């Protein structure tokens, strides 16, 4: 976006169309279902629901107990509870770098936020996801994108490689931007 400085975004070269950000979340949770999920208090309710349903006794709030190897972090930015950069964003990412904890950044609202600078170059950030439904009135078209630093095969890749995706929504998204 114009006026935005997101250092490191160009490192995310593997792009997949997704049915909104939610499909990206689900694929991430499937990949990391054996890990302990870590969220900030006030995180988007979908992540809290997945913590309860999918991770059960493998979940802790960030800040209640230290991050550890074997954890996985999902964090919205802008943060779901405040609309700003999450508290301790850079220090959480630095700790995730140190411990090799994979991070998914939910950036669904970045296009309408006042956040102009972010450091996305942290190696722990494996996936960034966003959608067009916050900027344009297309919430029922499920126009999302998953951006990954490294290629990893999964069903979303298979859908995209074989063009087994909602082409109407993809074309609408291209037209909107």
State what each model feature region is.
Residues 1, 11-14, 33, 66-72, ...:
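Catalytic phosphate/metal-binding cores of nucleic-acid and nucleotide-processing enzymes, i.e., regions
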Residues 1-23, 27:
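Conserved N-terminal alpha-helix of the aminotransferase class I/II PLP-enzyme fold
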Residues 12-16, 28-47, 62:
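Conserved PLP-anchoring active-site segment centered on the Schiff-base-forming lysine
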Residues 24, 44-46, 78-85, 109-112, ...:
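Short acidic, S/G/P-rich loop/turn micro-motifs used as interaction or catalytic elements
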Residues 47-50, 68-69, 137-142:
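Short, charged, surface-exposed secondary-structure boundary motifs
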Residues 57-111:
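Active-site phosphate-binding strand-loop segment of PLP-dependent enzymes
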Residues 115-130:
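A short alpha/beta connector and helix-capping loop motif
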Residues 127-177:
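Conserved core segment of the aminotransferase class I/II
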């Amino acid at each position: 976006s114009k006026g935005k400085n997101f250092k490191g975004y160009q490192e995310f070269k593997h792009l997949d169309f997704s049915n909104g950000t939610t499909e990206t979340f689900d694929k991430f949770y499937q990949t990391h279902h054996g890990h302990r999920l870590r969220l900030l208090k006030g995180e988007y309710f979908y992540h809290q629901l997945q913590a309860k349903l999918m991770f059960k006794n493998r979940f802790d709030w960030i800040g209640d107990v230290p991050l550890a190897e074997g954890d996985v972090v999902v964090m919205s930015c802008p943060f779901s509870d405040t609309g700003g950069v999450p508290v301790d964003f850079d220090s959480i990412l630095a700790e995730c770098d140190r411990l090799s904890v994979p991070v998914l950044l939910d950036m669904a609202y970045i296009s309408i936020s006042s956040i102009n600078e972010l450091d996305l170059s942290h190696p722990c950030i494996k996936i960034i996801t966003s959608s067009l439904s916050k900027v344009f009135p297309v919430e029922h078209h499920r126009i999302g994108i998953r951006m990954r630093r490294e290629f990893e095969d999964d069903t979303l890749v298979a859908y995209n490689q074989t063009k087994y995706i909602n082409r109407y929504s993809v074309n609408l998204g291209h037209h909107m931007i």
